[in-house]
Amino acid sequence: MEHSSWHALIKAQLPEGYFGKINQFMEQVYSQGIIYPPKEKVFQALLTTLLEEVKVVILGQDPYHGPGQAQGLSFSVPDSIPAPPSLQNILKELSDDIGVKKSHDLTAWAEQGVLLLNACLTVPAGQANGHAGQIWEPFTDAVIQVVNHLDRPVVFVLWGAYARKKKALVTNPHHLIIESAHPSPLSVYRGFWGSKPFSKANTFLKETGQEPIDWLR
């Protein structure tokens, strides 16, 4: 992370010494139990999607907390792992909106400029939201603020009440906010189905002179 295009700009948004606190937190929790994702993948979203490449931000809450699922990209799992219910619903909406994506590993999206960011970057095994409110939110809010300050128009995709609270950080009128219910089975019928976020994002990117995302990769 230290050598990425993100580092200095995120650091400037945070109190002095905050990166050190993050490092201490990670050393502590990874030494005490099973934490997801693997330590080397905690910052995967920022390492895969460089700041100068960001076109779309899809905000999640925290990583999957089952074995082998979390890979540092919101909603994504390796193809060797069955797609969790929310991801199944995302891919179904994509199928209805644009077409069928055969892989449920979303790395190809990240490589095209889709920042797959969780608000909380770590989770204890089996404990959803187990690290919520401890260290990560100021850091990931800073990431959102860095993207907000870009002159280049960006699409922010906010699914569910938690993500939609982050709308307050997106103040730049150049950007597009697409919001709906969360793809979780509990809320998918409250406005996620039929919301067509993928085609809406691509329409905006084309209108602003940018290459659309190949969502089927």
Swiss-Prot record:
Statement: the UniProt record of this protein carries the keyword Hydrolase: yes
Gene Ontology molecular function: any one: uracil DNA N-glycosylase activity
Record keywords, A-Z: Cytoplasm, DNA damage, DNA repair, Hydrolase
Enzyme Commission numbers on file: 3.2.2.27
Superkingdom of origin organism: Bacteria
Catalytic-site annotation from UniProt: D62
Compartments it resides in: Cytoplasm
Matching SUPFAM superfamilies: Uracil-DNA glycosylase-like (SSF52141)
PROSITE patterns (UniProt xref): U_DNA_GLYCOSYLASE
SS bond partners: none
CDD domains reported for this sequence: UDG-F1-like
Main localization category: cytoplasm
InterPro entries: UDG_fam1, Ura-DNA_Glyclase_AS, Uracil-DNA_glycosylase-like, Uracil-DNA_glycosylase-like_sf
Biological-process GO terms, alphabetical: base-excision repair, AP site formation via deaminated base removal
Catalytic activity from the UniProt record: Hydrolyzes single-stranded DNA or mismatched double-stranded DNA and polynucleotides, releasing free uracil
Pfam family name, one: UDG
Annotated family: Belongs to the uracil-DNA glycosylase (UDG) superfamily. UNG family.
HAMAP family associated with the record: UDG (MF_00148)
Function: Excises uracil residues from the DNA which can arise as a result of misincorporation of dUMP residues by DNA polymerase or due to deamination of cytosine.
Official protein name in the record: Uracil-DNA glycosylase
Lineage: Bacteria, Bacillati, Bacillota, Bacilli, Lactobacillales
Gene: ung
